[in-house]
UniProtKB/Swiss-Prot annotation:
CDD domains referenced in this protein's UniProt entry, alphabetically: GMPK
SUPFAM superfamilies: P-loop containing nucleoside triphosphate hydrolases
Organism the protein comes from: Pseudomonas syringae pv. tomato (strain ATCC BAA-871 / DC3000)
Domain of life: Bacteria
Reactions accelerated catalytically: GMP + ATP = GDP + ADP
Gene (UniProt): gmk
Protein name: Guanylate kinase
PANTHER family in the cross-refs: GUANYLATE KINASE (PTHR23117:SF13), GUANYLATE KINASE-RELATED (PTHR23117)
Length: 214
């Protein structure tokens, strides 16, 4: 039987653009009966020194560790990429990522542009997607509606968002989240199209191709 390796998808977005909600909706959609055996997308769980927010679960949303443990993991070469954002450290486990891909699962990696650069250097075959808000005003409103941050933090996030968005042209695909349902369909289309590339189809249907051309 042909071994099929999964595809790594890097997804980046400024805080408040809707990345987390879109990825969750994508994961929920693949559980629908019509997707059947094609339901093989996984989401990478990053390590972070950030404090856990209400409703988050350790090992599900993030692997929460203290700074000393994170630094130890860096020294041991455990991370494929790591970055510091708003004073918090984030990193992706190299061994878990490779194991998931080797098992044939597509893997979503939600990281910022700094981490994306690091990953693309080591894994140039990864697909990359950038999610944009429809406007700065809409982004500010979304951050305010969260009710999680002070005005000062929101201003800092807006400044960071502009910096983050300036790197959109480093990505293969861009999704503008002006309508959630439409943005979700755009995201699904990227995954569907990638599964139809010649390379992917050759991996999946190698025996069929040999038979057809015999």
């Amino acid at each position: 039987m042909t071994h099929i390796t999964g595809t790594l998808y890097i997804i980046s977005a400024p805080s408040g653009a809707g990345k987390t909600s879109l990825v969750k909706a994508l994961m929920d959609a693949q559980q629908e009966p019509q997707h059947g055996a094609q339901a093989k997308i996984r989401v990478s769980v990053s390590h972070t020194t950030r404090a856990m927010r209400p409703g988050e679960v350790d090992g599900v949303n993030y692997n929460f560790v203290d700074r000393a443990e994170f630094v130890r993991m860096i020294e041991h070469g455990d991370f494929l990429e790591q970055a510091e954002v708003f004073g918090n450290l984030y990193g992706t486990s190299q061994s878990h990522l490779q194991q998931t891909l080797d098992e044939g699962h597509d893997l979503i990696l939600e990281i910022d542009w700094q981490g994306a650069r690091q990953v693309r250097t080591q894994m140039p075959q990864a697909r990359s997607i950038f999610i944009l808000p429809p406007s700065q005003q809409a982004l500010r409103q979304r951050l305010t509606n969260r009710g999680q941050d002070s005005d000062e933090i929101i201003e800092a996030r807006m400044r960071e968002a502009v910096s983050e968005m300036s790197h959109y042209n480093e990505y293969e695909y861009v999704v503008v989240n002006d309508d959630f349902a439409g943005a979700l369909e755009d995201l699904k289309s990227i995954f569907r199209a990638n599964r139809l590339t010649q390379q992917h189809q050759q991996e999946q249907y190698s025996e069929l191709f040999q038979e057809l051309l015999a």
